[in-house]
Amino acid sequence: MAVPKKRTSKTRTNRRRAQKKARAPQFVECPQCREKKLPHRICQSCGHYKGEEIIEV
């Protein structure tokens, strides 16, 4: 079985783990109703996506 030749330092381990942090979701404004929504998603309040009504709300 493969075994590491050198011990991984705390700094190297922490640097690797720093990429796994949780980020706050970025919201954008819906151009139709001005509500906050997630990017590249249908607006939950008006049902529009890319200027077209996808679902009736």
From Swiss-Prot:
Gene name in the database record: rpmF
Region (Disordered): 1-23
Family: Belongs to the bacterial ribosomal protein bL32 family.
Keyword Ribosomal protein among UniProt keywords: yes
Keywords recorded for this protein, A-Z: Ribonucleoprotein, Ribosomal protein
UniProt source species: Natranaerobius thermophilus (strain ATCC BAA-1301 / DSM 18059 / JW/NM-WN-LF)
Lineage summary: Bacteria, Bacillati, Bacillota, Clostridia, Natranaerobiales
GO cellular component entries: large ribosomal subunit
The name this protein goes by in its record: Large ribosomal subunit protein bL32
GO molecular function, one term: structural constituent of ribosome
Keyword Protein biosynthesis among UniProt keywords: no
Lineage: superkingdom: Bacteria
GO BP: translation
